[in-house]
């Protein structure tokens, strides 16, 4: 399904938080949405792998990597696991690598930047905790909507079928 964050903001402005514009698209899917699962880790992606091995239908993984630009928290192998388990998308407050592989995958991926250096795999971090970056506090089970324009967050699911919110014009005799 396609999502348009600009249209969603126009309709639901009082219900959404807008993440500061700092992310770039790296995945093959330009827009994505779902209920978030959070991982908070720093230069260590073991918990990301563990989480992506779960069923991801209707879910978006939100990774607070502390904004580190020194190591990539997501690579082609982890993105393939996410795609296989049907995750809608991944947002990384940090870096990714193997970007040519990422853009060929049917998953939405947004991150700060890319770097070729991989992360450690020691399992240090937390899952399903509130995280804060980009001027927004993300709570587990909030709903995230992302496209090439930006990322928005809502406590409740938003109707993506924007057509149904418009009234049909009355026909005059």
Swiss-Prot record:
Cellular component GO terms held in the UniProt record: cytoplasm
GO biological process: regulation of RNA metabolic process
SUPFAM superfamilies in the record: RraA-like
InterPro entries: RraA, RraA/RraA-like, RraA/RraA-like_sf, RraA_gpbac
Gene Ontology molecular-function annotations: endoribonuclease inhibitor activity; enzyme binding
Subcellular location field: Cytoplasm
Keywords: Cytoplasm
PANTHER family with a match to the protein in the record: 4-HYDROXY-4-METHYL-2-OXOGLUTARATE ALDOLASE 3-RELATED, REGULATOR OF RIBONUCLEASE ACTIVITY A
Annotated family: Belongs to the RraA family.
UniProt cross-references to NCBIfam families, sorted A to Z: NOT-MenG (TIGR01935), PRK09372.1 (NF006875), RraA_entero (TIGR02998)
Subunit structure, as described in the record: Homotrimer. Binds to both RNA-binding sites in the C-terminal region of Rne and to RhlB.
Function: Globally modulates RNA abundance by binding to RNase E (Rne) and regulating its endonucleolytic activity. Can modulate Rne action in a substrate-dependent manner by altering the composition of the degradosome. Modulates RNA-binding and helicase activities of the degradosome.
Protein name per Swiss-Prot or TrEMBL: Regulator of ribonuclease activity A
Gene: rraA
């Amino acid at each position: 399904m396609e999502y348009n964050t600009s249209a969603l903001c126009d309709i639901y402005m009082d219900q959404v938080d807008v993440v500061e514009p700092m992310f770039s698209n790296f995945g093959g899917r330009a827009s994505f949405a779902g209920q978030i699962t959070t991982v908070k880790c720093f230069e260590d992606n073991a918990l990301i792998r563990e989480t992506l091995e779960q069923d991801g239908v209707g879910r978006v993984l939100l990774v607070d990597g502390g904004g580190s630009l020194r190591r990539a928290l997501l690579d082609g192998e982890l993105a393939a696991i996410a795609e296989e388990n049907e995750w809608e998308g991944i947002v990384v407050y940090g870096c990714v690598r193997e970007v040519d592989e990422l853009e060929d995958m049917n998953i939405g991926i947004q991150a700060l930047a890319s770097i070729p250096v991989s992360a450690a795999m020691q399992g240090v971090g937390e899952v399903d905790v509130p995280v804060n970056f980009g001027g927004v506090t993300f709570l587990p089970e909030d709903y995230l909507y992302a496209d090439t324009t930006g990322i928005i967050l809502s406590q409740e699911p938003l109707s993506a079928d924007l057509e149904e919110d418009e009234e049909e014009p009355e026909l005059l005799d």
